[in-house]
């Protein structure tokens, strides 16, 4: 389904894609984040944004998006920018989404935003961040960013909600940083990982962070959590 934009935001703009209109006239978009929903498909069940699958090349270099701001454009084409960083580094991209579009289009690959979904959050907080990640992903795809979908989850009980809207049979990215050696966190991560495999059936996984015992190495490419060049393929 297509989001009923005019029913949600019955406002007219001279140029809804104008950086000046949407990022300089307002300190943040606030309620005008509804503008991002224009032209985006949503699931019929819970109205999560629908993210299209990715089937392109596998990148060789990962770097956090906030570390790339001062890099010359000539170096951006071979880099995969990720949002596996503090939420404070992601918020500017949410608050000023149009401001960064032209720059993001110059980057070879961009992984979905990764607003945190913590186990100690209440459910609505988890779903809000899941919604934001999907909305930003669909918005980027619609505006010419070479986006790699990156599903995430916070608990097994609501895994279907976390996965709703992410593409099936796609190359995806998955993060394990922050899990560490905590047994409960590893257990939650692995349970969600197996459920994600069953629901989305990804064709390949770009894995950022440490390998977790029991995951599918045969369909994974592993990238170290150091924001430096280098990668290795799963066996």
Description of each model-found segment:
Residues 69-73, 80-81, 85, 90-234:
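Eukaryote-skewed repeat-based solenoidal scaffolds used as protein-protein interaction platforms
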Residues 13-104, 121, 196-199, 233-234:
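Non-catalytic, usually N-terminal nucleic-acid engagement modules in DNA/RNA processing proteins
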Residues 1-3, 24, 52, 220:
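Intrinsically disordered, low-complexity segments enriched in small/polar residues
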Residues 2-17:
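Phox homology (PX) phosphoinositide-binding domain
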